[in-house]
């Protein structure tokens, strides 16, 4: 799966997990996540992580997650890409 496809899937995960609806369509790789999307609070981060694990078939360790991971859609996509390549 190439990065563009992963980005689209991560966007779908965010749309579904956070119930963003059509607002998710406007997200780009540079879109800020934490602090910008009101639905993405600390509890929602757990929901998104679980959804990412289920969608992409890997497990995320607590030590793998940082604020930088959720800084932008691109940083979250890069995280998923790295996990898939590991």
Where are these regions (language model features)?
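Phosphopantetheine-dependent thiolation modules in NRPS/PKS and related acyl-activating systems
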Residues: 1-40, 44-55, 59-86
């Amino acid at each position: 799966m190439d990065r563009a496809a992963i980005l689209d899937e991560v966007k779908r995960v965010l749309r579904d997990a956070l119930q963003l609806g059509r607002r998710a369509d406007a997200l780009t790789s540079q879109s800020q996540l934490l602090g910008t999307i009101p639905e993405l609070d600390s509890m929602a981060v757990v929901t998104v992580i679980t959804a990412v694990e289920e969608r992409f078939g890997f497990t995320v360790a607590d030590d793998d997650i940082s604020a930088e991971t959720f800084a932008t859609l691109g940083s979250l996509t890069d995280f998923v890409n790295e996990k898939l390549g590991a």
